[in-house]
Amino acid sequence: MAVSHLPTMVQESVTFKDVAILFTQEEWGQLSPAQRALYRDVMLENYSNLVSLGLLGPKPDTFSQLEKREVWMPEDTPGGFCLDWMTMPASKKSTVKAEIPEEELDQWTIKERFSSSSHWKCASLLEWQCGGQEISLQRVVLTHPNTPSQECDESGSTMSSSLHSDQSQGFQPSKNAFECSECGKVFSKSSTLNKHQKIHNEKNANQKIHIKEKRYECRECGKAFHQSTHLIHHQRIHTGEKPYECKECGKAFSVSSSLTYHQKIHTGEKPFECNLCGKAFIRNIHLAHHHRIHTGEKPFKCNICEKAFVCRAHLTKHQNIHSGEKPYKCNECGKAFNQSTSFLQHQRIHTGEKPFECNECGKAFRVNSSLTEHQRIHTGEKPYKCNECGKAFRDNSSFARHRKIHTGEKPYRCGLCEKAFRDQSALAQHQRIHTGEKPYTCNICEKAFSDHSALTQHKRIHTREKPYKCKICEKAFIRSTHLTQHQRIHTGEKPYKCNKCGKAFNQTANLIQHQRHHIGEK
């Protein structure tokens, strides 16, 4: 916040708000003694810098109080307040020497500030002489654009709005001007603007650390937020409130941005297209993340284990593994989750909601990724290909499991029998052999199963559903593995080879049966 050199000071010295941090009474009460001391030091430093440049009138009572370390609270008026001593008197004109960076010598800025409680505005007109180090500051009074003429309360003088255009005509920036969105400062080069903006970034970071505390805390899970609106959105996770409803399908959302995103599913709009592979996305941020697949960029790194990620959301999810934090708890079964999305997906188990429906066969799913994987059954798409053996897979999880066949990796070991598995779900399924647990029950015949996939396959006996169809002979199957085995009849593929005699088979069961002959020969 401190004024570092004159050009920045002139732009930021028209109203109190431009050089001060303002607090409401409630916000002031939330600050710790250390934060109030920081506030006082920053304000006094700003005032001292402005005094040294000769741009201020008599010292206001406010700063006398601050110097004496008296408790002070800014006035809380609807339109804010403007201090007369912060600007030059209309009759006075001064020339001030200043040290100006070389790259800024050919720049000038006109900056206007408005008082929200009045119809007139005051502007500081800054004339920056090219190649020199002299600055002329003149106070001018202009009328509100919506009124033909209005008297300024400070000087009593009246001007038409045309005066502004007349006086500022000679000060138009070049076509290649780059303006800072934070303070309005103009630069002739984008590289200079980027350097300048780092000052704001550092200031904003410091303000967040010292002043902008996360004051809005959720009573349910203790998570804190900078803004009350963010807390309100977060609390809807706990309450289940979804005030934004889609008129097309009736689906409801907790935030309006999610509804806007969802509506593009109905329209089919995907305006953001990858220029490398042509893949299109609903959101620009998704395209940015996708681009990193091509570039290999992973800018978000875990400071504990150094693992890197394509997007911040994946890093946040990963960091919860280290912290063990699971703030989202299901009121139905007590299960807790480290992500709100996982929590919402879990709740659909209890509600039975399956909002993602296949337009080919009508099958519905709880999560969109399951629908995407399912649709590949119809399209035959297998985007995940193994570099070792050339085998392709419909989903990434199956591909990841397959790769462990080549590496021999089995990191998940049973604590009861020491048997090892390639993935955690296989271990969980195996452990149910020891416990006898069968948590998945058929709602038609009440037969129970130890894993969900077995229940899904069983239900097809009742429904007679055969979703896996051969494209060559149209024969259909209940299981995808049965279709894969059947297709080898057409292709002649025999991937299972006997290591004793070299004979090959199209099914593992046939290979096992064959190997028994070798054992019998011995």
From Swiss-Prot:
Spell out the PROSITE patterns in the cross-references. Answer: KRAB (PS50805), ZINC_FINGER_C2H2_1 (PS00028), ZINC_FINGER_C2H2_2 (PS50157)
What's the domain of life for this entry? Eukaryota
- CC annotations in GO: nucleus
State where it is primarily located.
nucleus
Where does the KRAB domain start and stop, copy by copy?
14-84
Q: Which SUPFAM superfamilies match?
A: beta-beta-alpha zinc fingers, KRAB domain (Kruppel-associated box)
Region Disordered, annotated ranges: 147-170
Which range is the signal sequence, renumbered to this chain?
none
SMART domains in the record, alphabetically? Answer: KRAB, ZnF_C2H2
Q: Which UniProt keywords apply?
A: DNA-binding, Metal-binding, Nucleus, Repeat, Transcription, Transcription regulation, Zinc, Zinc-finger
The UniProt GO MF terms for this protein read: DNA-binding transcription factor activity, RNA polymerase II-specific; RNA polymerase II cis-regulatory region sequence-specific DNA binding; sequence-specific double-stranded DNA binding; zinc ion binding
Q: Which PANTHER family match?
A: ZINC FINGER AND SCAN DOMAIN-CONTAINING, ZINC FINGER PROTEIN ZFP2
Relate the protein's function as given in its record.
May be involved in transcriptional regulation.
Q: Which family does it belong to?
A: Belongs to the krueppel C2H2-type zinc-finger protein family.
Protein name according to UniProt: Zinc finger protein 454
* Organism of origin: Homo sapiens
